[in-house]
């Protein structure tokens, strides 16, 4: 998961390519990190579970937070690619940490 404006999609692909074949990816199906992870996972034959946000969730911050909690609940390990400013990515990382999940965060610059 991660920021839509993460400037280094190749880092996402490199991470996915390092995963074992039995791994799976859960994604919110957004542009940016989600799209890069999905593309790399499908190219490698890694299972992808898509949990897209509904229109209501995109329009309502409270509903968006609930959807991000569902992503946290569904994962064993949260891997985030953060642009350093996205509040949604930061909040989801905090939710995962509060839930006792293993969390890995890769920080990059926002895309210009």
Per-range role (PLM):
Residues 2-111:
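Acidic/glycine-enriched connector segments
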